[in-house]
């Protein structure tokens, strides 16, 4: 196995699941365990100025090998895994020379199949890493960490490769939208950066959703069912009414590309009280604002129907479409496209991110930061997998991008 695979498997063994129901950063202390390991590894391979903050951010510098008046470039990946599916203990499976058929996931009844995921046929003859059906794999985004780490090691061991100063960073809590809450942009010291947090080999992204979180509190009134007529107010049924008043087909399972949605992530309740958690997403700022306005209209309607205060909400913007901040710096995509071409991808696939990245918020904080592929697929669930050859190519991509930046003139 190559080093990038060894590194990934090691990182995947750490339980780093974030938690969306806390108000601290990082949301889970266990993320510190991987952060400490990464800090030590960076130091061991010779990265300079390595540090770990008390908020679980790991930073480091790869010194320049040439004197050039070029921008400082950064590469970032996140340590946490999604709270939407179990991630511990992770037991990866390696499938060598994939034959194009079904892959049984461990001792479970689950099968990773091209009948469900036709693009698996693209990987015939290559080597895949899957989960075992009990947990997610964690390629999102421990593959990105492994690729950045091996890039750093390779460049330090090959000082003959010309490049400017390179910054690396690993962040917590990206999966819950708080990945850069306490990220030190000024201290990081990069002029531009890339997150390595994407999907299939040959893809890159610079458009994200505009995003908001929505928490809905429905207050009912419980009365014995035998004497409930004209008295009971069932919060569960009102909550269902709320959800039914949102567009039925503006949901994740019915949308793709630039189509936005409302997503009911979870719901808990009884007659007296019900709580629903949503995310709201759209690439268009105008439609995004219209979605939030619709929520307020539904709340007003239900409160008029059932009594003021029956439905209360907390709605907060999470991040915005980073395209606005990337468009003035499209040379970032041009450089990546040149690197892809040298690696056999004449036209990289550029699609909108149907989610967010740390780069979305960093771009609005003055660090333009598009997203690069890792080689993974089917994130946040048991069918997650990654191609080993894609990981190896991504390392080559990062090295080439780093080299190309030496020829960019710093403004």
Can you describe what each PLM-predicted range is?
Residues 233-252, 286-298, 338, 343, ...:
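His/Asp/Glu-rich mid-to-C-terminal helical/loop segments that flank catalytic regions of hydrolases
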Residues 20, 49, 160-165, 248-263, ...:
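Flexible, glycine/charged-enriched surface loops at secondary-structure junctions
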Residues 2-29, 129-130, 222, 319, ...:
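N-terminal capping segment at the start of a domain
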